[in-house]
């Protein structure tokens, strides 16, 4: 199994892959090995599986080659490669391995990479139809080539299935919605004078966390607390912005937390915000809803669909984000 993020990282793949790996291992008695990028040393982490971590801070070319070689090495005695990240590297390694590939698609890595580096401003859908220069066009072609080499693609939404079909994918596509465990107790919202707002996210630009911090600053209320759970390349910039805000003492960066610590914050949250420019079907949003927390989210991916007629939360206009 290949994945770009894995616990203690926070994010959809880091939530999903351990669950499905545990099911394959414990219920089906499959032999599982996981390859991921990480900021941590293997010796510092207690895993339930065989996990190989590659330092994501290595020089990009060296890291890329090391990842391909490691996938090849681990995959030689395996029957199947399950790809939930590191898709291009897995595809190249599989040219030599010739194994079956099942791939989970939750977005467009070419769009996310270009957007996070501020090379584009277009939305997910606009990106698919617009013509770009050589660099971005090449990345789009590589992404399409990699996806089309999969034997089966699994995706959480019809929107993403349409995206995959438009790439020219001819093999089987399965829509399997993301799921969460229902907690035994729900949050008690608005039970005191403080309003606790929570975000659980990778700290990357398309999540629009900077804009949420600025909006909270504009409200300038000592009664509003913003809990930001997660880590990522935008952390230092977001912390700098929060220190310049009107209510810096009420904006808390929790970093990476264990599941029980996140659950504790959910139990004390009044509002959950998901303000991304794109999502497939976000685990964190579903988890917040499972606690009965009112949610505010942008109408991207399947978010609008799962909110129904705003009886489970409210839609934020992308224009106002």
Model-derived segments and spans:
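Conserved donor-binding/catalytic core segment of Leloir-type glycosyltransferases
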Residues: 2, 154, 180, 190-207, ...
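Membrane-proximal helix-turn-helix segments that form the acceptor-binding/catalytic region
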Residues: 68-75, 125-153
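Short alpha-helical donor nucleotide-sugar binding micro-motif in glycosyltransferases
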Residues: 75, 147, 256-257, 264-269
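Acceptor-binding helix/loop patch of EC 2.4 sugar-transfer enzymes
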Residues: 102-141
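Nucleotide-activated donor-binding/catalytic signature segment of Leloir-type glycosyltransferases, i.e.
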Residues: 239-260
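Aromatic "clamp/platform" in nucleotide-sugar-dependent glycosyltransferases that forms part
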Residues: 277
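Short hydrophobic beta-strand element within catalytic cores of glycosyltransferases
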Residues: 294-297
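Conserved small/polar residues in nucleotide/adenosyl-binding loops
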Residues: 319-321
């Amino acid at each position: 199994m290949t994945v770009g993020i894995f616990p203690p990282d926070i994010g959809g793949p880091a939530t999903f892959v351990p669950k499905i790996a545990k099911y394959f291992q414990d219920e089906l008695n499959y032999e599982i090995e996981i390859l991921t990028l990480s900021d941590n040393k293997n010796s510092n982490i207690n895993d339930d599986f065989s996990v190989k971590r590659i330092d994501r801070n290595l020089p990009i070319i060296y890291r890329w080659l090391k990842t391909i070689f490691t996938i090849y090495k681990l995959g030689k005695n395996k029957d199947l490669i399950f790809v939930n990240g590191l898709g291009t590297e897995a595809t190249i390694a599989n040219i030599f391995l010739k194994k079956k590939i099942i791939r989970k698609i939750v977005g467009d890595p070419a769009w996310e990479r270009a957007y996070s580096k501020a090379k584009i401003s277009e939305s997910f859908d606009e990106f698919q139809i617009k013509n770009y220069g050589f660099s971005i066009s090449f990345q789009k072609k590589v992404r399409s080539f990699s996806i089309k080499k999969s034997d089966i693609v699994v995706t959480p939404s019809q929107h993403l299935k349409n995206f995959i079909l438009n790439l020219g994918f001819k093999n089987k596509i399965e829509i399997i919605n993301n799921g969460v465990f229902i907690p035994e107790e729900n949050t008690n919202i608005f039970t005191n004078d403080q309003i606790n707002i929570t975000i659980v996210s990778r700290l990357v630009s398309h999540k629009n966390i900077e804009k949420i911090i600025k909006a909270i600053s504009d409200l300038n209320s000592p009664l509003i607390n913003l809990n930001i759970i997660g880590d990522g390349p935008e952390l230092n910039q977001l912390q700098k912005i929060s220190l310049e805000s009107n209510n810096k003492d009420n904006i808390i960066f929790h970093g990476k937390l264990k599941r029980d610590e996140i659950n504790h914050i959910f139990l004390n949250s009044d509002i959950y915000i998901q303000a991304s420019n794109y999502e497939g079907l976000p685990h964190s949003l579903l988890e917040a809803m499972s606690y009965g927390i009112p949610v505010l989210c942008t109408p991207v991916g399947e978010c609008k669909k799962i909110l129904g007629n705003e009886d489970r939360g409210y839609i934020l206009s992308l224009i106002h984000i």
